[in-house]
């Protein structure tokens, strides 16, 4: 029986990519800089001491970080018996965004440029917003700028509730984000508005429209809910997920995976929100998985709750929670299963600003007859997609080199 389980630690980069200079990200290292802050006592909120990830270390995380950066992250060393295959991957895709990282990992790099809203203020063309408002029957909107999602709620959340006008904002990524109060504006109204925006954004080549529902009564208690929805464009060609589905296999999305792939190549969608619920749902789907199945989970909290918010202690605590639960998952693996742990980009919480960082990602693989030891530098995330194709004996992907023979 052949099954693959993919754990996407969203934003968990392990050192600046080879082309990080083009992005202003030389020195970025999500894993290493979190470990350094922990070792220096700068991440002792809700936790304390060095970064403790013994199970990830056994899968080769520390060694992959060493190969990527030339040094072991504080608290990690070569004196660990590694049981898995480990490596690190550079990104071929032109951007450091979520769809690019996910699609490339599944064998389809994004070799074209996304559209972006580069102006920090008055970010959106009036022609675009006029069309969206007219179709939605709205009189106006708030925002129209680059912003942190939490900060803009503090600044404009109350005005949004008073006026009924949605909050439109963007970032350095190819995104159009819409924040609305889940109760006063209505979740269904927000989702319909985002569907309209997705349709109108076609000519602008924007990768995602993101619905950002929130609740609360004022700036002190506004909080996002778990009903986020991503409206992505479809990948430019078939991913390994599509190929397995087309061959009669099953592809189970846990969390926001289905949204990222525009629901292409997915046979089952499991909704879950929050690190604990995502891990619980992953375990349940592994227990149910039959032959020729992929279970693919995105652990978005690392990125959305801690990376973008530059919360080093929160990120470290979340990683330690994830690590503590790994043995539950490992106990469910069967002899021929393939487990992959990776990331889609970096989001170094010690880095200036609030955007993603251009980083290499870990490639931690266990099972499928792989020998423990180094996989070295992978020149594309697509090596993972090609390896999955090899594992399931599917038609080869156009990009990537398999590390499974």
Curated annotation (Swiss-Prot):
Residues annotated to bind Mn(2+) 2: 303, 308, 356
Enzyme class label: isomerase
UniProt catalytic activity: 2-deoxy-alpha-D-ribose 1-phosphate = 2-deoxy-D-ribose 5-phosphate; alpha-D-ribose 1-phosphate = D-ribose 5-phosphate
Source domain of life: Bacteria
Protein keywords: Cytoplasm, Isomerase, Manganese, Metal-binding
Record note on cofactor: Binds 2 manganese ions.
Cofactors demanded by this protein: Mn(2+)
Compartments, as annotated in UniProt: Cytoplasm
Classification via NCBIfam families: deoB, PRK05362.1
Job description of the protein: Isomerase that catalyzes the conversion of deoxy-ribose 1-phosphate (dRib-1-P) and ribose 1-phosphate (Rib-1-P) to deoxy-ribose 5-phosphate (dRib-5-P) and ribose 5-phosphate (Rib-5-P), respectively.
Family: Belongs to the phosphopentomutase family.
Protein name, UniProt field: Phosphopentomutase
Lineage: Bacteria, Pseudomonadati, Pseudomonadota, Gammaproteobacteria, Alteromonadales
Gene: deoB
């Amino acid at each position: 029986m052949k099954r693959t389980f993919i754990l996407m630690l969203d934003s968990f980069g392990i050192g600046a990519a080879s082309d990080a200079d083009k992005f202003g990200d030389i020195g970025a290292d999500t894993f290493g800089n979190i470990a350094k802050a922990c070792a220096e006592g700068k991440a002792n909120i809700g936790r304390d001491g060095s970064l403790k990830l013994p199970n990830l270390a056994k899968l080769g995380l520390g060694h992959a970080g060493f190969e990527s950066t030339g040094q072991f992250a504080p608290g990690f060393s070569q004196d660990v018996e590694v049981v898995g295959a480990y490596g690190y991957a550079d990104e071929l895709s032109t951007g450091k965004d979520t769809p690019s990282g996910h699609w490339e990992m599944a064998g389809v790099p994004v070799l074209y440029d996304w559209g972006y809203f580069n102006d920090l203020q008055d970010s959106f063309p009036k022609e675009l917003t006029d069309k969206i408002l007219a179709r939605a029957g709205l009189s106006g909107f708030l925002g129209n700028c680059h912003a942190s999602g939490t900060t803009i709620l503090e600044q404009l959340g109350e005005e949004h509730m008073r006026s009924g006008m949605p909050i439109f904002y963007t970032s350095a990524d190819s995104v159009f984000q819409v924040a609305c109060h889940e109760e006063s504006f209505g979740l269904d109204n927000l989702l319909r508005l985002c569907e309209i925006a997705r349709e109108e954004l076609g000519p602008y080549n924007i990768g995602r429209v993101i619905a950002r529902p929130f609740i609360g009564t004022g700036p002190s208690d506004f909080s996002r809910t778990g009903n986020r929805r991503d409206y992505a464009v479809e990948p430019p060609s078939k991913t390994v997920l599509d190929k397995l589905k087309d061959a009669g296999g099953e592809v189970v999305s846990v969390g926001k995976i289905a949204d990222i792939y525009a629901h292409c190549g997915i046979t089952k969608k499991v909704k879950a929100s929050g690190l604990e619920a995502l891990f619980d749902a992953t375990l349940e789907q592994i227990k149910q998985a039959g032959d020729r199945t992929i279970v693919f989970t995105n652990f978005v909290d690392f990125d959305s709750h801690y990376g973008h918010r530059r919360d080093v202690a929160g990120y470290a605590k979340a990683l330690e929670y994830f690590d503590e639960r790994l043995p539950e998952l490992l106990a469910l693996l069967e002899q021929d299963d393939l487990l992959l742990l990776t990331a889609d980009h970096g989001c170094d919480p010690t880095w200036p600003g609030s955007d993603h960082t251009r980083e290499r990602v870990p490639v931690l693989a266990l099972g499928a007859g792989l020998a423990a030891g180094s996989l070295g530098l992978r020149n594309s995330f697509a090596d993972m997609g090609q390896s999955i194709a090899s594992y399931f004996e599917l038609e080869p992907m156009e990009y990537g080199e398999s590390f499974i023979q």
